[in-house]
Amino acid sequence: MRADVQNTIEKIQKSLDLLAQRLDVETAPYRLEEFNARVEDPTLWDDPDAAQKLMRERQMLVDAMATHDSIKQEMADNIELIELGEMEDDADVVSDAENALRALEETAAKKELEALLDGEADSNDTFLEVNAGAGGTESCDWASMLARMYVRWAEKKGYKVELQSMSDGDEAGIKSATYKITGLNAYGWLKSESGVHRLVRISPFDSAAKRHTSFSSVWVYPVVDDNIDIEVNPADIRIDTYRSSGAGGQHVNTTDSAVRITHHPTGIVVTSSEKSQHQNRDIAMKALKSRLYQLELDRRNAAINEAHENKGDAGWGNQIRSYVLQPYQMVKDLRTNFETSDTKGVLDGDLDGFMAATLALDASGKTRAEAQNG
């Protein structure tokens, strides 16, 4: 067996070992038996929310077991084919099996990354906010480009995207937009996108065709699961209704029933501008609870993050990625050093490489400063 093929097998085995560890493969069959017993309980659906949560957890376990077993079996089958092909001097059989192992390596690596999405809220749906930075029309246009980028990414994933609120820019683009993205692991994938995103390009709004730098921020926070109890003291909030209107476009609603909720202790402000005022109150309150939950997650992780980060790595919580369109084309993540010259693809939603690099870095135990220094 050639050295490169052996190396491929070792990489698959490494991914398989991590999957087995995350799954706790020895106890998985017993846990599935417990789930099955609970599913057969005739009183299960007396509490629909708890029942749905149980069914989701059971399905996640079933899928994880199937993934592990499938990769393990496919690897063994192709190793056997290579050995038989070499014994019988059948180059075609060997070549086909080697190609299958290379494809399996990619699949196993992807499943390994997905297995890292095991944080408390990683499996949840998510809210995603985009806000234009200082810079007027330039930043508003950049915020609009970012919003489109994330909508395209979510659509490619098969996620459901709902616009919660949007404020148009004075001349072009948007000042802000909030989306709800629904799908398994939506928060887990997107959580690393929070931060400041920098764009460098020749401005389409500058008659002198000068190069401009624009900034917009992204904030991602999980939709609060019904089983997570977040209490909001009515005395701590102010609810305002207002008229929401924009300059036009398919995303703009015009309504007298838009709702803004301000949470005084934290200064958090959330809005919703659907047609129903009652619906807007519910949407805005859910968004507020989600933001408060994200604050709690941040507090819990503060000590870990402080220990994890190099003290000189001041850019992590602020600027996370640069998008250079002129004088050359490059998108680079400042935390992981992952980069690509396919700027068009990135702005069209091809973000998985960046997200995977961040997950891999966090799993490696390296500080972001160490990653930046190679």
Curated annotation (Swiss-Prot):
Gene3D superfamilies: 3.30.160.20, 3.30.70.1660, Release factor. It is found in: Cytoplasm. One of its GO terms (cellular component) is cytoplasm. It holds the Pfam family RF-1. Its main location: cytoplasm. SMART domains: PCRF (SM00937). One of its GO terms (molecular function) is translation release factor activity, codon specific. Methylated by PrmC. Methylation increases the termination efficiency of RF2. The modification N5-methylglutamine is found at Q250. Keywords: Cytoplasm, Methylation, Protein biosynthesis. SUPFAM superfamilies: Release factor. PANTHER family: CLASS I PEPTIDE CHAIN RELEASE FACTOR (PTHR43116:SF3), PEPTIDE CHAIN RELEASE FACTOR 2 (PTHR43116). Belongs to the prokaryotic/mitochondrial release factor family. Peptide chain release factor 2 directs the termination of translation in response to the peptide chain termination codons UGA and UAA. This is Peptide chain release factor 2.
